[in-house]
């Protein structure tokens, strides 16, 4: 009986029923992301982003990563990361402005990061970018989190 109660608790706990939404994004040797917008819907409690570097060049020549911050923090986070080098994935260790980030990868490689949408603030603009030196000005896109489900919007009107 004790085992059955423990199993029921695990199966019914929020972590066990969390809806992980998967997003894929491609980066190229031409210093661009192929997707300009990534969108996450209200039913997602966790997001897993997988970055695919579709290029051919190695990480130390044309490496890319995927970094998510508030739009207002992009330049400051990118500039702070330049000074810490490739060994730190061009991300200042402990930078709390970074919501989520992958490691720097070279051509033909993949890297993933998973994070909770609880970190995101409704009504806040988010941007993803590559933090490799000189990349963030052209390698960026919008990250849209729809905190309200389509049912909420239909019942309460759009706001």
Predicted features by range, described:
Residues 61-69:
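Short Gly/aromatic-enriched secondary-structure transition segments
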Residues 100-159:
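Extracellular/periplasmic metallocenter environments
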Residues 13-15:
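N-terminal signal peptide c-region/cleavage motif recognized by signal peptidases
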Residues 1-4:
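Positively charged n-region of N-terminal signal peptides that target proteins for export
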Residues 32-37, 96-101, 112-114:
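Short structured motifs
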Residues 19-28, 69-91, 133-159:
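Extracytoplasmic/periplasmic copper-protein system
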